[in-house]
Structure formats: structure tokens, C-alpha cells
């Protein structure tokens, strides 16, 4: 297959939770980037003809037994290498420097002083804020390397061997908290690697359509359509690639938002002229979920049931070989990789039955949410679909904490509709990354009229973010929150209290379950 771009920077995954962000930041510069496991061979890399290689961070100690390594022949390819955190320590070990446990671990913001203006720090200030996350540090750089930056706790915060185009930083430039992190990555891509920045979403569409046609051939594809941004973009992209070889199946599992089922059918069946089959499986899903309160178990049940329903319905259709899903990079990250810890399993990733008979097509699994929106716009999908609020595959099933009942679902459905209506009225719907209501598994005492009540509490979650990997709670004006709270308490039965979640990610995730 033709390579997507003549210039590419490959990121090797050593297990850090933010590794895919590095790939994302490089793409933002107009340079195509892919993430590959640290086990990739030098020969495989050579065939890819990368302009540069980045070694990611990771949770291990470079000197520990069994710590992930890379093919040592990678250092002989003559390709520029940037080591980030663990990646720099690995490079240090390889070239004979010394890595040891830090006396004082550094987690969070720190100030570094630049002592050597290598190409990586070209045009950047001497003092700058970076995001540290390390328990080890470099005690002695390898021969040929110069210390570029330091601080009192980290004598080698950055280093370089410019003769061989090797660079390393002991902080995370890919995280927004690093003040000039984007500039460093830009310097690496352009000043060090010599990239020109000619990659775009149009290139991505061309590549994915080619991949889809090559993978599918003359066979049929069944698309899991939910009406959310991800599955909508997948459906339109695949339909653009193979036309009537695509059949969309929309399962109403009883865990959808208010009015969502009707909206999906109108948008895709009528608006895009796609073949959409609607399946009413509400009773089946709720029956399986009865009495289940553990969030992981709920996710697994919903994920499995989705596939089983698809298989049953697909068996009624002719020759369905492929299943398309809207899995994103963030789904894969949070479900864990070979070297990263699992945060939560995603129904698109961890909930699939082992005996599934479909071959998967996941054209968005290298994209972040904001990239998916850009892709949707590029494909001509209307704004009301592209900017629809993100909705998890398990639906309201993970916004009802604890056991799911019809009553609880109705509370979340109605309160969420009020929240979305008022956020849009206030003109905040494009400013806030994601907003929804959740129902904690708790009741509290209240007074309505002259009577004592003992009813549910509704939680409001609203966050600002760029890519969903990190987020901050949205500063919604108090008067808007007051209107939302008043309406929910007055209009939604069995609710007497509304609370606002002001936790960032991390430490919390965006969804409550």
C-alpha cells in the first residue's frame, strides 16, 4: 500500500499513559506520525523510512531486570532520535551513561534552566515550566552527550549529542502543562528531522478509504451505528469508500439519551440515504443488567450483548463478514496496552467476546476526539452531528451508578436533556468539551413544599479539554448552573438535590464509571 506521507515520525511505545499524545502533537504540526510497540525491529523501521524516531516515557526503571528495551540496531539507522523520560534513560543505558533512583521523585510542574541551546531548545527561553513525572534520573550522561537543561532536583533535565542527532528530555513535552513542549516537538520535527509538514486530514481520508477497500474487497460490512460522533464518522467514511456494501445496524438498547433513537434514524436513513436497520433490544439489555452494580461488569455485559445482538441479526442478512466500530485512540489507551496499565475497559476494546465471528474495521483507532470532529467536517457531515455531545458505548448504563432501573434511567435521561438545552441556550455548547448528568447510587433528605423528601441526587459533569486525555472542570456561570439546578429539581421526578463535579482529569476520569 502507498505510504500516507513521504515524511513520518515513528513513536515507540514503552508504556506511558500519554504516549499517544506524542503522536497526536506531531500530527498537529502537519507531520504524519504512528505509534508502534517497542518490540519493532530496526529492519521494520527501516522499511518505513521515518524522518525521526521518538522513544516514549514509561512506568519502568531502565536499569530494572525485564524492563522494556528496543532493538539496539535502531541506533545504527542514522535517524534522529528523541528520548522522553524513560526513553532518554534507555538511550543513556545503551550508550554507557548511568541511570539511578532519584533521591526526590518529581511529579508535576517544575522549572528548568536551559544551559545549552541545542536545536531542541532553539528560540526558547532559558527558564521554563515543564511537567515532570519520574522516579529515576540520569546521574552521568553518556560520552558525547551535553547537558542542555537542569534544575536542582534533576541535574540532567535534557541532553543532546547533536553530531549524531540524539536528544533526550526528562520531562513530558507532549503534556499541555509543559510551557514550551509543542515548540520542542516542532523543533525536533523541523529543525532536527527536516520535515516540511505536508500531512492533513485529507491525506488521512485517502489512506483510510484505500485501506477499507483493500481490507473489504467485494464483501459486506456491518456498522455499529449509535448516532454518536465516532460511529457517525465511521459510517460516513466507510459508506464513502464502499457505498452499498455497508449496512448500518442501530441497536436501541434502552440506554440512549432523550429523543436519540428517532434522531439517528432520521439523520442517517433519510439524510445520508444509508441502509439502516433498527433493532429494539431494550428488554434484552435491561434483563441482562438486572441486579448488576459493578461498573466493569456492566461494561462487559453491554459490550458482549452488543456483539451477540449483532451476530444474531447479521445472521439474518447475507454474507456479513466485517464489523465496523468507532474505537478511538483514547479507548485503546484507557483499556491498557502491553506496557500500560488498564484504567477502565472500553466496550469497543475490552468487552468483545473471544468467539466473535466478525473481522473488525476500526478506521478511527489512531485518532483523538477532536481529530474525529475535523474528519467529520471534512467528510461533509452536518455540525449538529459532528458536534453532538460525546456519548459512551454503554450509554446511560455507566451514568447510572450502581444497579440500573427504568426509574433511574428516566432521571438521567430527563436531567441530561435539561442540561444540554440550557448549555446550548447559554451559548456554551462549543466551549465545553463534554457535559452530562450522572446519577450516584445515593439518596438524601430534602424539603419540597412542607413535606420531607428522601430522593436522588443528580451530579453534573462538565469539562474543558483539547483531546480528552486530560481535562479541567468547566467554569459554567453560576446563574446558568442555578437555572439548570432549579429546572432539574422542579421538572425531574424523584430528585431533590443537584451537585457539580469540580474534579479534573487526572485524578478523575471524565465519566463517573
Curated annotation (Swiss-Prot):
GO terms for cellular component: cytosol. ATP binds at residues 226-232. PROSITE patterns: GATASE_TYPE_1, GMPS_ATP_PPASE. Keywords: ATP-binding, Glutamine amidotransferase, GMP biosynthesis, Ligase, Nucleotide-binding, Purine biosynthesis. Residues 8-198 form the Glutamine amidotransferase type-1 domain. The active site is at residues 85, 174. It is an enzyme of class 6 (ligase). Residues 199-388 form the GMPS ATP-PPase domain. InterPro entries: Class_I_gatase-like, GATASE, GMP_synth_C, GMP_synth_GATase, GMP_synthase, GMPS_ATP_PPase_dom, NAD/GMP_synthase, Rossmann-like_a/b/a_fold. GO terms for molecular function: ATP binding; GMP synthase activity. It catalyses: XMP + L-glutamine + ATP + H2O = GMP + L-glutamate + AMP + diphosphate + 2 H(+). Its EC number is 6.3.5.2. Signal peptide: none annotated. Pfam families: GATase (PF00117), GMP_synt_C (PF00958), NAD_synthase (PF02540). CDD domains: GATase1_GMP_Synthase (cd01742), GMP_synthase_C (cd01997). Pathway: Purine metabolism; GMP biosynthesis; GMP from XMP (L-Gln route): step 1/1. The keyword Nucleotidyltransferase does not apply. HAMAP family: GMP_synthase. Catalyzes the synthesis of GMP from XMP. Homodimer. This is Putative GMP synthase [glutamine-hydrolyzing]. It comes from Halalkalibacterium halodurans (strain ATCC BAA-125 / DSM 18197 / FERM 7344 / JCM 9153 / C-125) (Bacillus halodurans). The gene is guaA.
Amino acid at each position: 500500500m502507498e505510504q500516507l506521507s513521504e515524511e513520518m515520525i515513528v513513536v515507540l511505545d514503552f508504556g506511558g499513559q500519554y504516549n499517544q499524545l506524542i503522536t497526536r502533537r506531531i500530527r498537529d504540526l502537519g507531520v504524519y506520525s504512528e505509534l508502534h510497540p517497542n518490540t519493532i525491529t530496526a529492519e521494520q523501521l527501516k522499511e518505513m523510512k521515518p524522518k525521526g524516531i521518538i522513544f516514549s516515557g514509561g512506568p519502568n526503571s531502565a536499569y530494572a531486570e525485564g524492563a522494556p528495551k528496543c532493538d539496539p540496531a535502531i541506533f545504527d539507522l542514522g535517524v534522529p532520535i528523541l528520548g522522553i523520560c524513560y526513553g532518554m534513560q534507555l538511550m543513556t543505558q545503551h550508550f554507557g551513561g548511568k541511570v539511578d533512583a532519584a533521591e526526590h521523585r518529581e511529579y508535576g510542574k517544575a522549572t528548568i534552566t536551559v544551559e545549552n541551546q541545542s536545536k531542541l531548545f532553539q528560540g526558547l527561553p532559558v527558564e521554563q515550566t515543564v511537567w515532570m513525572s519520574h522516579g529515576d534520573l540520569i546521574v552521568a550522561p553518556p560520552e558525547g552527550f551535553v547537558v542542555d537543561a537542569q534544575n536542582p532536583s534533576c541535574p540532567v533535565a535534557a541532553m543532546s549529542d547533536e553530531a549524531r542527532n540524539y536528544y533526550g528530555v526528562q520531562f513530558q513535552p507532549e503534556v499541555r502543562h509543559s510551557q514550551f513542549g509543542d515548540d520542542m516537538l516542532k523543533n525536533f520535527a523541523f529543525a532536527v528531522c527536516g520535515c516540511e509538514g505536508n500531512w492533513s486530514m485529507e491525506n488521512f481520508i485517502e489512506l483510510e478509504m484505500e485501506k477499507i477497500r483493500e481490507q473489504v474487497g467485494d464483501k459486506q460490512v456491518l456498522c455499529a451505528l449509535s448516532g454518536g460522533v465516532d460511529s457517525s464518522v465511521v459510517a460516513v467514511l466507510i459508506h464513502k469508500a464502499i457505498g452499498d456494501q455497508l449496512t448500518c445496524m442501530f441497536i436501541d438498547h434502552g440506554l440512549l439519551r432523550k429523543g436519540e433513537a428517532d434522531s439517528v434514524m432520521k439523520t442517517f436513513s433519510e439524510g445520508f440515504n444509508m441502509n439502516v436497520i433498527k433493532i429494539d433490544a431494550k428488554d434484552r439489555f435491561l434483563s441482562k443488567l438486572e441486579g448488576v452494580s459493578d461498573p466493569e461488569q456492566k461494561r462487559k455485559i453491554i459490550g458482549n450483548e452488543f456483539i451477540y445482538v449483532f451476530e444474531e441479526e447479521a445472521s439474518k442478512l447475507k454474507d456479513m463478514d466485517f464489523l465496523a466500530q468507532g474505537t478511538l485512540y483514547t479507548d485503546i489507551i484507557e483499556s491498557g496496552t502491553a506496557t500500560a496499565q488498564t484504567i477502565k475497559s472500553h466496550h469497543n476494546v475490552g468487552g468483545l467476546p473471544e468467539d466473535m465471528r466478525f473481522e473488525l474495521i476500526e478506521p478511527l483507532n489512531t485518532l483523538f476526539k477532536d481529530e474525529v470532529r475535523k474528519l467529520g467536517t471534512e467528510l461533509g457531515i452536518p455540525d449538529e452531528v459532528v458536534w453532538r455531545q460525546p456519548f459512551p458505548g454503554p450509554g446511560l448504563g455507566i451514568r447510572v451508578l450502581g444497579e440500573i432501573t427504568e426509574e433511574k434511567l428516566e432521571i438521567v435521561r430527563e436531567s441530561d436533556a435539561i442540561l444540554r438545552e440550557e448549555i446550548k441556550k447559554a451559548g456554551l455548547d462549543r466551549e465545553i468539551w463534554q457535559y452530562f448528568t450522572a446519577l450516584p447510587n445515593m439518596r438524601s433528605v430534602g424539603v419540597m413544599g412542607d413535606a420531607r423528601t428522601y430522593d436522588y441526587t443528580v451530579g453534573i459533569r462538565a469539562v474543558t479539554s483539547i483531546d480528552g486525555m486530560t481535562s479541567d472542570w468547566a467554569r459554567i456561570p453560576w446563574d446558568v448552573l442555578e437555572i439548570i439546578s432549579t429546572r432539574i429539581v422542579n421538572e425531574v421526578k424523584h430528585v431533590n438535590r443537584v451537585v457539580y463535579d469540580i474534579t479534573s482529569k487526572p485524578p478523575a476520569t471524565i465519566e463517573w464509571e
